[in-house]
Regions:
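ATP-dependent NMP and nucleoside kinases share a basic, alpha-helical "lid"
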Residues: 71-128
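Short beta-strand-centered segment that lines the nucleotide-binding/catalytic pocket of NTP-utilizing
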Residues: 6-23
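An accessory alpha-helical subdomain
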Residues: 134-137, 141
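Short, charged, surface-exposed secondary-structure boundary motifs
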Residues: 20-21, 115-120, 172-174
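NTP-dependent small-molecule kinase module
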Residues: 79-81, 121-124, 143-178
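Conserved beta-strand scaffold positions in the cores of enzyme catalytic domains, especially
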Residues: 8-10, 103-107, 160-163
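Short, small-residue-biased leader/transition segments that mark boundaries at the very start
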Residues: 1-3
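Conserved nucleotide-sensing/catalytic segment adjacent to the nucleotide-binding pocket
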Residues: 18, 23-68
Length: 178
């Protein structure tokens, strides 16, 4: 199995939040704003996704600045893209909007406490939150996410894998890249 000959790219939904007044005001009034659809710039994300999918190239990388509530575009041309990875809190929802089955959905199941440690560390370091706020925001977003996505809420796709601690990753990789 050789994946080094394949060129891939990762689109993180974390880099596609809305900007401007919406993202500055609404978080003050809407609990868990950044974990809800209203915060996600789905139009821009879909535009980038479709361009990469159709053309096999990417022109720039996008980065969301949580303190300034802006998206920075950095020129970074990538050619001959043969696979595209979508990751982030809106990935599952986005996969439900795809019109074809030309994708593989991987969901990594983690324990709530393990996930919270990782997210709190990220939020303190990258999003300028204090630890208590990051913990409270995580608990709210965990509830929002699991309310929204009951088991099997993803549309039926034979290429859906749920990865847990005891999952045989080699089997999944063989199916993905052979």
């Amino acid at each position: 199995m050789c994946i080094r000959d394949r060129n891939g790219i990762v689109l993180s939904t974390d880099n596609y939040y809305k900007t401007g007044l919406i993202s500055k005001l609404l978080p003050k009034f809407v609990e868990g704003f950044f974990d809800r659809n209203i915060s996600f710039n789905s139009k821009l994300f879909k535009k980038d996704f479709d361009f990469i999918y159709k053309n096999g190239i990417s022109i720039c990388d996008r980065y969301y600045n949580f303190e300034k509530k802006t998206i920075q575009s950095i020129l970074n041309e990538t050619f001959n893209i043969s696979f595209l990875i979508v990751e982030g809190i809106f990935a599952k929802e986005f996969s439900n909007s795809l019109n074809n089955n030309d994708y593989i959905f991987l969901e990594i199941k983690t324990k709530k406490n393990e996930c919270m440690k990782r997210v709190v560390l990220r939020d303190v370091k990258e999003r300028g939150k204090d630890k208590k706020q990051a913990e409270n925001d995580f608990l709210k977003s965990w509830s929002i996410y699991y309310e929204k996505f009951k088991p099997d809420s993803i549309k039926k796709n034979r290429n859906k894998f749920i990865i847990e601690k005891n999952t045989d990753i080699d089997q999944i990789l063989k199916k993905l890249f052979n």
